[in-house]
Amino acid sequence: MVAEAEVVFQQSLPAVLEIELFDGVSSAVKSPVSSPKLGFTQSTASVSGSLTTSPVQADIFPEGDCDPSVLDYIPTIRSGSFADIGPKRNMEDEHIRIDDLSSQVGSLFELPKPSAFYAVFDGHGGPEAAAYVRENAIRFFFEDEQFPQTSEVSSVYVEEVETSLRNAFLQADLALAEDCSISDSCGTTALTALICGRLLMVANAGDCRAVLCRKGRAIDMSEDHKPINLLERRRVEESGGFITNDGYLNEVLAVTRALGDWDLKLPHGSQSPLISEPEIKQITLTEDDEFLVIGCDGIWDVLTSQEAVSIVRRGLNRHNDPTRCARELVMEALGRNSFDNLTAVVVCFMTMDRGDKPVVPLEKRRCFSLSPEAFCSLRNLLDG
């Protein structure tokens, strides 16, 4: 496993994280130094603007009749990513890839191991909002918030992490409102994936998507916050907004949750059709979990979750390279005429005893039998 941290961006912007920065998918430049076995739960943010945390299911960290191999499982994390401007004139996607979070914030926090953090930001109305959140992500999500400190993951810890993530989304949203250099009509969707030990927690506001592959089956770890989502449509209409026939919020946005876009939001504390509160899902990783795919809507506009999982799974079986898998996913979406920027992140979970060899599905293996005559000929050939 290579412990690395990566922030990828397209524009030439000042770097603020102590990590390697990549301009698109080119070579890295150094940044200046600055700062169904287990439980599956979902937390939906309140629509009133207050912070709420739904209770964590008791079986998310079971200790009773659970298979001991599940309790002993520790994922080994590696990842890759790829981004392409697609047919658009400007690149408004940003993403973060940190395989070893402890190496980045270890001086500030005690974290369970392994720990990792990933994010995709899909900007609109310009690239500034997505770039701003990406640049300040460590501060928003870890430094400014009361992120819980412990080396052990428990139900209490999970609740505290969820609250911290929810606050981070709201604080990032407020920071965009206060930054005079960012237009009120500029915004970004945001999806983050945090791994702490066996815990995977995904927070989402917008139409990026995270999909977990469990034994080849796609499990959505986020919901698309689009006007066609009936629950989102109801919330928007109850908040005084409206959805047009062609699927736009207040005739402007194709999403119902986003950071920024303060020209569409009422004053802080008021109920607005467009909100920044994330929807949070969490799951306990097991040996059955192979990888996580995170992508912007440019991927999901033309690919289903299961199609994306199948593409990545085939790639890992061929070459076992998550970066190549991310590129293949983007190229497949482009081949299907995606009309947006495209970003894909592939996070692999691999137990220590699997090695680096790709796992070949049983159905791909072939057995051959020899006739007695052929067997005798082969033995004579081997015996010389």
From Swiss-Prot:
Cofactor (UniProt): Mg(2+); Mn(2+)
Q: Which top-level group of life is the source organism from?
A: Eukaryota
Transmembrane segments in this chain: where?
A: none
Q: Name one GO cellular component term.
A: nucleus
User: What remark does the entry make about the cofactor?
Assistant: Binds 2 magnesium or manganese ions per subunit.
Residues noted as binding Mn(2+) 2 in the record, renumbered to the chain: 122, 297, 340
Q: Where is Mn(2+) 1 bound in this sequence?
A: 122-123
Which Pfam family, an example, fits this chain? PP2C
Picking any one GO molecular function of the record gives: protein serine/threonine phosphatase activity
Name the protein family: Belongs to the PP2C family.
Q: Which reaction does it catalyse?
A: O-phospho-L-seryl-[protein] + H2O = L-seryl-[protein] + phosphate; O-phospho-L-threonyl-[protein] + H2O = L-threonyl-[protein] + phosphate
- Classification of source organism: Eukaryota, Viridiplantae, Streptophyta, Embryophyta, Tracheophyta
Q: Name one GO biological process term.
A: response to salt stress
| Listed name of the protein | Probable protein phosphatase 2C 49
Reported EC number(s) for this entry are 3.1.3.16
InterPro entries per record: PP2C (IPR015655), PP2C_BS (IPR000222), PPM-type-like_dom_sf (IPR036457), PPM-type_phosphatase-like_dom (IPR001932)
Q: Which UniProt keywords are listed?
A: Hydrolase, Magnesium, Manganese, Metal-binding, Protein phosphatase
Family annotation (PROSITE patterns) = PPM_1 (PS01032), PPM_2 (PS51746)
